[in-house]
């Protein structure tokens, strides 16, 4: 059996040269609310944002954008003041998890979520949080997120749900 038949998955930080491939994936999955080129470039350039790329056989297959926030639940004010997000905050919000349609169902989203969880654990953050539509709830629950109900975010016309993954390795203040 040839080794080139085994898929090679690589996770890495995004670089500016990736933005065109990212834009294609963004358009495929978020056509009505896709981020523009300037936003994608800003996300890549921002030091306080984790922008992870999943490559399958050296082709960009998906990405995850996460930013550190101070609250378990994302508010409109936090979105509007994203320049104030800091690395040493309590939670990381997942702004985008997007896989190219050609590569969906191969576990790349789960790998990106696992990498994001590792970052949160390394930073001693309390966890990850995100909002999603009802059809994605079971996917995130499969990845150990807890559905905390309908989001009170006012930046979307759709009904969105708040989901949280709590860091199981975080030492609680009242524990010995």
Predicted regions, residues:
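A short beta-loop-alpha structural element at the N-terminal edge
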Residues: 8-22
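Glycine-rich phosphate/pyrophosphate-binding loop shared by adenosine-nucleotide-utilizing enzymes
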Residues: 9, 59-63, 92
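C-terminal "cap" of GNAT-fold acetyltransferases
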Residues: 15, 126, 133-134, 153-176
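Active-site rim helix/loop that mediates acceptor-substrate recognition in acyltransferases
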Residues: 30-60, 65-84
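Conserved acyl-donor/pantetheine-binding loop and adjacent beta-alpha core of acyl/acetyltransferases
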Residues: 64-98, 104, 154-159
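Conserved catalytic-core motifs of GNAT/GCN5-like acyltransferases
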Residues: 69-71, 131, 141, 146-162
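Conserved acetyl-CoA-binding loop-helix of GNAT-fold acetyltransferases
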Residues: 99, 105-118
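Conserved GNAT acetyl-CoA-binding A-motif
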Residues: 113, 119-132
